[in-house]
């Protein structure tokens, strides 16, 4: 597999944490020091951990498993959408709806409604409605597309979840934890790594850093799909045992 290098990380600013006064003591072992009251993340720790996460994702994708990309804050949403689409993975880029995983049955009903409205908007049904009714359905369609468009083809629960900014996506992580879905997460110096199976200590705000994480993850998914069609079953067992060992 093509690995991310220290140089890639330095150029993207992965090593710049948050102001020292906002630090989370649970991230202490990943912090190299401080400069101008900003914590500096130890990339000698981050680099192997990131490459481990990429290997895990590549192996998962080789077994035709689904990785859900999650990043709903403004700086991440657009890149999440683009990179997930590039590798054909489901994503949540707007807002995490409570129960997206733990109450998937209800979510599935909303996805069905989204598909019905999509079909109606294309088959001429909207044109036969009153202006008011057509407008209401168009608004419903837009709202559902914004919330669920990225997972409408997921077809069931994901096999792993990749999260940018674990603080911002704490509800998503707790839902994944409840269901035993492995979590890969970018954890900045102000965040807690709890509930994350594959920790990537790094800056979760800088656009170039976010692009590096997501671009590399999408590449890993594409490589895995390309490399593997066989051995999927043993492989899912291996992945499950890896996640259980933490």
UniProtKB/Swiss-Prot annotation:
The keyword Acyltransferase does not apply. One of its GO terms (molecular function) is structural constituent of ribosome. One of its GO terms (cellular component) is cytosolic small ribosomal subunit. GO terms for biological process: translation. InterPro entries: Ribosomal_uS2, Ribosomal_uS2_bac/mit/plastid, Ribosomal_uS2_CS, Ribosomal_uS2_flav_dom_sf. The keyword Lipoprotein does not apply. Keywords: Ribonucleoprotein, Ribosomal protein. Gene3D superfamilies: Glucose-6-phosphate isomerase like protein, domain 1 (3.40.50.10490), Helix hairpin bin (1.10.287.610). It comes from the Bacteria. HAMAP family: Ribosomal_uS2_B (MF_00291_B). Belongs to the universal ribosomal protein uS2 family. This is Small ribosomal subunit protein uS2. It comes from Stutzerimonas stutzeri (strain A1501). The lineage of its organism: Bacteria, Pseudomonadati, Pseudomonadota, Gammaproteobacteria, Pseudomonadales.
């Amino acid at each position: 597999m093509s690995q991310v290098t220290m140089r890639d990380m330095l150029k993207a600013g992965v090593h710049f944490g948050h102001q020292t006064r906002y630090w989370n003591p649970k991230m202490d072992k990943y912090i190299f020091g401080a400069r101008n009251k900003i914590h500096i993340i130890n990339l000698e720790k981050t680099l192997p951990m990131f490459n481990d996460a990429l290997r895990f994702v590549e192996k998962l994708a080789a077994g035709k498993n689904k990785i859900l990309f999650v990043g709903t804050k403004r700086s991440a949403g657009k890149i999440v959408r683009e990179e997930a689409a590039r590798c054909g993975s489901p994503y949540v880029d707007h807002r995490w709806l409570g129960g997206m995983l733990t109450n998937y049955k209800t979510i599935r009903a909303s996805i069905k409604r989204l598909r019905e409205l999509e079909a109606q908007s294309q088959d001429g049904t909207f044109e036969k409605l009153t202006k008011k009714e057509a407008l209401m359905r168009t608004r419903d369609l837009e709202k559902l597309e914004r919330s669920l468009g990225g997972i409408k083809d997921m077809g069931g629960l994901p096999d792993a979840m990749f999260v940018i900014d674990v603080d911002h996506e704490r509800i998503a992580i707790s839902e994944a934890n409840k269901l035993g879905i492995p979590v890969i997460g970018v954890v900045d110096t102000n965040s807690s790594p709890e509930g994350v199976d594959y920790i990537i200590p790094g800056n979760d705000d800088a656009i170039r850093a976010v692009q590096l994480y997501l671009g590399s993850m999408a590449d890993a998914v594409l490589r895995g799909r390309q490399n593997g069609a066989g051995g999927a079953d043993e492989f899912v067992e291996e992945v499950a045992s890896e996640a259980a060992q933490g």
